[in-house]
Amino acid sequence: DKGYISPSAARKISKKAKKEHIPVFVDSKKTDLSCFPNAIIKINEKESKKVKALPEDYELIITVGKSGAIWNGINFPTKDVEVFDICGAGDSFFAGFINSYLMDFNIEKSIEFANSIAAISVKNFGTYIVKREDL
C-alpha cells in the first residue's frame, strides 16, 4: 500500500485530469483498478492474473519480462540482450513509456521506446538509471 491514495480520491483525480486533458499513469499492485478511469495502467504478467476489476475507460499495458509488453492483444517484443539484473526493469519501462508518451501521445511508439529502456536497464547491475548516451 505504499503511496496509495483512496479509491474515491483516485476517481476524482482521474476525472479532473480527463477534463483538463492531462494523462494519468498508474502502476499499481492493487487487484481492483476500477478507481482509475481514463488512465494508462501498467502491470506485470503476475499482477494481471490477480486483477479483479478494471475501470470503464482505460489503456492496459502488461509487461511480460523478456518477452516485452502486451497492449490491446498486440505483443511488443524486446531486443534479446544479456541480462545481468532485472531489479527496476518495470520501473525503467514505465519511466521510458511516460517520457515518450508525453512527447507524442503514441502508445505503440512509447511501448517500443520503453522496451529499449528496460533492455538497457537489465544489462546493468542494480537499479540502473538509463542515460541519454545509453540510447
What are the roles of these predicted feature ranges?
Residues K79-F97:
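Short glycine/threonine-rich catalytic loop with a Thr-x-Gly-x-Asp
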Residues D1-K79, I86, L102-I107, I111-S116, ...:
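Ribokinase/PfkB-type carbohydrate-kinase core domain
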Residues S121:
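Short alpha-helical functional segments enriched in proximate histidine and acidic residues
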Residues F97-I98, A118:
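Buried hydrophobic packing segments
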